[in-house]
Amino acid sequence: MALSNITFVKGSGGLGRPLAGQDHFSALIFYASALPSGFSSNARIKKFLSLADAEAAGIRLDYADETKAAGSYEVTGIGANGDTVNIKVTEPYGAVIDLGTYTKAAGQTTVTAVAAAIVAIINAGTSTHGYTASNTAGVITITARPGLGIFLNSGTPITVATVGTIAGTLTQFTAGAFSRTAIYHYHISEFFRLQPKGVLYVGIFAVPGSYTFSEIDTIQSFADGTIRRVGIYKDSSAFATGDMTLIQGVLLAQEALHKPLVAIYAANIAAVTDISTLTDLNTFSNYEVSPCISQDGAAVGALLYLTTGKSITTLGAYLGASAFAKVNESVAWVQKFNISNGVECEVLAFANGQLFSAAAITDNLLNMLDQYRYVFLRKFIGQSGSYFNGANSACSLSNDYAYLEDNLTIQKAMRGVYSSLLPALSGPLQLNADGTLSDNTIAYLESLATPNLDQMVRDSEISAYGVRIDTAQNVLTTGKIIISVQIVQQGVARQIEVPIGYTTSLS
C-alpha cells in the first residue's frame, strides 16, 4: 500500500459549459397536471445546461411525487409462544424482499402487541429494504419503498408464511401511483449522457383536451427560435399517426417563421401486444417527424416501464445522440453512436415491454419496422453496444427528407442563407438599362448567400453547393428576386456491399 496521502480526482462536465454554435440546442416537451418545484403555471419552461440544473429545478429522482402502494396484514390470532410470521414482497424482475421474521414471545398477549412487534421488525430493516409499517389495533399497514409506482398494485406480491396457530388476514397492495418526475429525470439524464455539452429546454405543459402540439411553438418562441430538435413525450393517450400529422403542421409553421426544427415523437404503445401491427408510415408526408419505439430492456428505462405501466422509450437518448451529431450525420453511425453505456440500453426492448430476445422478434420483423419508418435500437454480430437503426422520418423513403439528418442539414443551410441575405431585404437593386439585374447586383447577392454555405462545406456538413440568380427576372414589376441554391449532400453509407470470392490470380 502506498504512503498515506490526500488525492484529488478532477471531474468534468459538471459546469455544463455549452458548445459553440446552436446545432445542439434541443427541447423536451412533457404533459402533466402537476409540476416540479422549480416550475409553475406561469413558468412552464426551463433551460438546462446539465442534469444538475434540472435537479436544482425539482426534477430529482427522489420519487417525491409518487404515491406509494400500501397493503395490510391483520393479526386475528396471537398463537402460541414460538410461533412465527414471515413477510416477503416480490418486486420487479422477481426480486424477493424479506421484510423479516417475527417469533411470538411471552408477554405479547394481544393482537395489538403482536402487530406492534411485527411492525418493529419491519421498520428496523427500512434502511435496507425501504419498506415501512404501522400498527392500528392489530392491523399492520405495510407501505412500499420509493420507486415501485404501480407495480405492486396487481398480482400477489405480498406473501405471509406462518408456523403454528398464529393467524391473520392479508390484503394485497393497492393505490400505488408512479412518479412523473422520475420519467422527466430519466430522459433528461439520457440526453446529457449522450450529449454532455448540450443545451436543453424542458417544457411541462397541462394535458390538453385534444392535442394540437402548439406547445412546440411556445417552447421555440421561449428559446428565441434557437431549438433545432424537440422530443415530445406523450403518455396520456396512445400512439397515433394523426399526432405526427399535427406535429408536422406546427413544424411547417415554424419554418415559415424562420425557426425550423425537427421533432421526435414518443407516445404510449404499452397496449400494443403485437409490434408487427404498427402502421406503415410510408403513406404519410410527415418528413420532419421521427417516431421512436425503442426502450431499455433491463435497466432504468425497463424499471420505469414496469413501475409506470407506460411506454418510456429511448426519447432522451435519441434526442441526445442527435444533438451530439453534426447535422449531416446519421445517429446510426456505428463508429460514433453506441447508445449503450454497458448498462442502460444494453438489453433491448420495444416500448411495449417486449424484449428483442423474444422469439417473435425476428430479423424479418426488424426489417419490416425499419421499412415502416420507425426508429429503434439494434445489435450487430461481433460488435458490442447498441445502435439506432436510423433517424427515419414518418414519410416515404423516396422523400428527399426521409431522415432527420436530411432535414437538419437543409434547415441549417436555410438559417445561414437567411441570416446572410437579411441585410439586403428591401435594399436597392442596380439594374441594367433593359431592366435586367446588373452584374454587380448579382455578384453582391451571391456574395451574401455563400459565407455560411462555405462554412458548411469546410465543416464537411455538405459536399458542395451552387447559387444561381436569373438576370432576366422582372424585379421592377414583381418586387421579388429569386436566388436559387442547390446543395450536394454528404452521403451516408446505409448499406455496404462487398463482392468476395476466390480467384486463380489477381488482375
Enumerate the predicted regions with their spans.
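Polar low-complexity, Ser/Thr/Gly/Ala/Asp/Asn-rich disordered segments used for subunit assembly
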Residues: M1-H24, L51-V96, T101-V300
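N-terminal alpha-helical "arm" segments
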Residues: M1-I45, T504-S507
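Short hydrophobic beta-strand segments
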Residues: S26-A32, R228-Y233, G466-D470
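Catalytic cores of large soluble enzymes that bind and process phosphate-bearing ligands
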Residues: K46, T110, F239-T245, E405, ...
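Compositionally biased, low-complexity/repeat regions
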Residues: G203-F205, I462, G466-S507
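Long, internal scaffold/assembly segments composed of regular secondary structure
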Residues: L278-N286, S290, G297-S330, V334-K336
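Long, contiguous, structured domain-core segments that constitute the functional module of a protein
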Residues: L319-T441, S484-S507
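Short, hydrophobic/π-rich interface segment
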Residues: D439-S463
